[in-house]
Amino acid sequence: MCYTYQAGSQSARIDCYGRRFICECMCDLLRRQWHEFRLNLRPREFAYWFVQNLILLFCKLFIQTQLFGGEHYAPPAPATLLLCGHKRDWDPLLCAPRLYYQRGWWRPDSRRMAFVGREDMFLRGFMAEIVDSWEWPRWAMRLLDLTNLTPIVRPLRAYPIARALEYSLRSLLFDVYQQQGNLPLQEVLSEEMLDHLDRWATETASRQRRFKPRPSRQLHVKDILTWDYREPLMQNLRRRFLVPEQYAWYQARQRAKIEAQLQALGAVLRRGDTLWIAPEGMITPDGAQHRVRGGIAALLALAPPKTRVLPVNITYDFMTTGRMRACLSVGAPLEGLADLPRAELSARVLHALARQIVVTMTLLGSRFLWERLQQGQPDFDEAALSTAVAQNMRLLRQQGAAFEQGLQKDRTLQRRLRAFITYGLRSGLLIRLPGKQYRINPAPFQQRRETFFWLNPRYCVNELLTLEAALTHGERSIATTPG
């Protein structure tokens, strides 16, 4: 009941309505929190909710995340398919909690996000493959080779998808062992491969006294699924490695497996969840775009009719001091993709992904250094860097590019420029000269990294070139690299 007074009765009534509105908002907020709390206490949901909050805490401490285009994801939809450019291994883990808490920790989004990962992530020894070139101790690598991530990634709503490029001979032998049993190697591998294993075993025994080789024709599948035989089995599967019967079985098995995996992804969308998938099928190793995989068209055909398809891209600003920045950009929904021919579908998706690249100091600075090297002018000062970056920003702003937050302010830009130079000096990208001059070290641009390849400045240059091509010429201008 509202009480009014003779003096100031109108203001008192407005104040009463304001208090009532605040109370209703608080009650609505508490109802939302109670609903989420009850939902997240369920056994199947608790692990997902708990890990997402751990990831969110990690990002708050070590990564400064910026969200662009959150209004495209916020409205409810029957189902949402996120087509995301893939830059780092942790892209889906960063994307999920940021969109879940896009309106703040007290107003979580009730939608769950599933993501698609490479199939070998669900096999034993995947972690050993990831850290293979990190020069870890041998005992640690042996321990990782025995671990299986399936109990961890399954509660996070991870779904496998098979790709021939990542299917090794060892993966096939795991599949054979699970489906056909412990067969003799002679019934699986070709004579060429058996001879190769014998030669490798002899050479290894000459270097390692503990290794006791046995003729490969006396071994069974389980005998070589150990750490000792891991090295020769990690090469990509080839037809000549198998006997004809096993290769025919492998082809039929892959077709049935991929069909079942696509059906599982379609079921995720039919449940109304959000699905994260990389249309290029892998992490881009050079910053350029690769062709869209055919499975995207098949997945769109299985999705519900009103599925919302959103292009997403994450741009990392890591050439700085302090915390790395991650710019998560969500684009407007893509309509009518299921009706397009494959070539047109690929061009439209790649163009939409390229438009979501956010301009960062890392991209601008890398572009400047690369152009100076191409011009044969490796020496520069801070004023030259500042002038070139400001000019490039002006052109990109006119074309409608998005910039990371604060970069267009003069004071912030100067601070980012100094942080970029400091990073370059620490990482060996720049060499300090007398008189506040700097020289570009060309070696980091020429190195081919097997791990952490995204640290190469050419990676960042290719990202910016992809954005510029999309802004300038449209869909047909974006050159793709064969995947």
Protein language model features and the residues they cover:
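Non-catalytic C-terminal accessory region of glycerolipid acyltransferases
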Residues: 2-39, 163, 169-483
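A transmembrane-helix-recognition feature enriched in membrane-embedded lipid enzymes
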Residues: 5, 9-69, 94-97, 108-111, ...
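Acidic/glycine-enriched edge-of-secondary-structure segments
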Residues: 50-58, 85, 246-253
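Conserved H-X4-D acyltransferase segment
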Residues: 55-133, 178, 183-212
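Short aromatic/hydrophobic-glycine micro-motifs
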Residues: 63-64, 157-158, 377, 429-430
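A short, aliphatic-rich alpha-helical micro-motif
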Residues: 75-76, 153, 269
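Short glycine-/polar-rich loops that comprise or flank the Walker A/P-loop
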Residues: 109-113, 155-157, 273, 305-308
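A basic- and aromatic-enriched beta-loop-alpha substructure that forms the phosphate/nucleotide-
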Residues: 125-188
